[in-house]
Amino acid sequence: MKNQIKKEILILGNGYIGNRLHEELDVELSDKRIHSLADVEDEIKRFKPAIIINCIGYTGSDVDDCELNKDKTLTANTFIPIILGEAALRNKIKLIHISSGCIYHFDYSGDKPIAEDKIPDFFELFYSRTKIYTEVALRALSKVSPNLIIRIRVPLDNRPHPRNLLTKLIKYKKIIDIPNSITYVPDFIKALKHLIEINANGIYNVCNKGALRYPELLDVYKKYVPDFEYTVIDYKELNLVRTNLLLSTRKLEESGFKVRQIKDVFEECVKGYLKY
């Protein structure tokens, strides 16, 4: 990414994704907690960005925690992104909002991978509802203030972190075996750079092609850590409300970005992970 573009970018939200982007993009990261439009305006005056990447969000320890902390969830996942959208409009700044693909029902027996223009329909989790509310608002704002909404799904990374899918699976020991769309974080960062460089607007699913079945990834991990053991259980045994789905990557590919198959990153991911 060109140095001039880097100088114009400000990241808000210093959690997992925000810090990964800060590290890889080498751009400004605000450490200020945003509570109001005035807070955003202060950061805009301080950094003078042309692009704001919003990585602010709340999931708690997991999405079930959002059911217990609806105030925090609604504030971080809906209220603040809408404030950022208003600030972007007022200051003629582009907003890039990091969203989630966990907003759909999916029927594995007949559905095709979900494209960006399908209307979100998964309201069973409060977390998902807050993500949907935000997308509706930002899509309305986009008619007068172009923005970019990036949907990622179940981040998988090549370094340990509590939010990393591989870290979670190693900890769980008992896992389900359902194909899911996954976002490999190093590829997500490359895709984000690409979308910034082509000045993309609208909604993009940013995940890898194909589907990940958790045992496939853990079998690669077990190849390098032979003592590791895991058990596959039936999804119903979890007794939890979750989204399991496949997202289409066609739009991202048609933008000129080469999307890798998720299965092609397993070795790279595990080898990188074990170096830490």
List where the protein language model places each region:
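N-terminal Rossmann NAD(P)H-binding glycine-rich loop of SDR-like oxidoreductase domains
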Residues: K2-L25
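SDR active-site strand-loop-helix element
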Residues: L12, I52-I56, L95-G101, I150-I152
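Rossmann-fold cofactor-recognition segment
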Residues: E28-D39
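NAD(P)H-binding glycine-rich loop region in Rossmannoid oxidoreductase-like domains
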Residues: L37-N77, L89
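Catalytic helix-loop patch of NAD(P)-dependent Rossmann-fold dehydrogenases
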Residues: D71, T75, F79, I103-I150, ...
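NAD(P)-dependent short-chain dehydrogenase/reductase
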Residues: V136-D187
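Mid/C-terminal beta-alpha module of Rossmann-like enzyme folds, strongest
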Residues: A191-N244
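Conserved C-terminal active-site "lid" loop/helix of NAD(P)H-dependent oxidoreductases
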Residues: R213-D219, I233-Y276
